[in-house]
């Protein structure tokens, strides 16, 4: 298990089970370090509209296995914990309140 300090200074757990789940997606193969990097220094962080305890960390990568895409790392922040749920590549950011960068 890895513990990553996010851009807000919070400790986020990335378990071996979650990283195995994420890397099962062929388009994310070889992007384990990018997942950590997005948490530490994202382009943008938004609150999920479907679950206020979930935040979406985004960074754009011009070269992925499927072309230029946003890498989204999904983190759940229940009381006294924080862990990566999943990560995926996407063409656009989901709507939601922007937490980072601070306006």
What are these regions (language model features)?
Residues 1-103:
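Ribonuclease/tRNase effector modules and their secretory precursors
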């Amino acid at each position: 298990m890895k513990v990553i300090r996010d851009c807000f200074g919070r400790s986020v757990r990335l378990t071996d089970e979650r990283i195995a789940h994420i890397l099962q997606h062929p388009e994310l193969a070889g992007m384990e370090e990018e997942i950590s990097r997005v948490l530490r220094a994202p382009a943008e962080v938004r609150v999920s509209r479907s679950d206020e305890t979930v935040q979406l960390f985004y960074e754009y990568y011009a070269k992925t296995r499927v072309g230029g895409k946003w890498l989204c790392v999904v983190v759940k922040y229940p009381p006294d914990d924080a862990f990566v749920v999943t990560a995926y590549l996407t063409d656009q950011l989901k709507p939601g309140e922007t937490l980072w960068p601070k306006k």
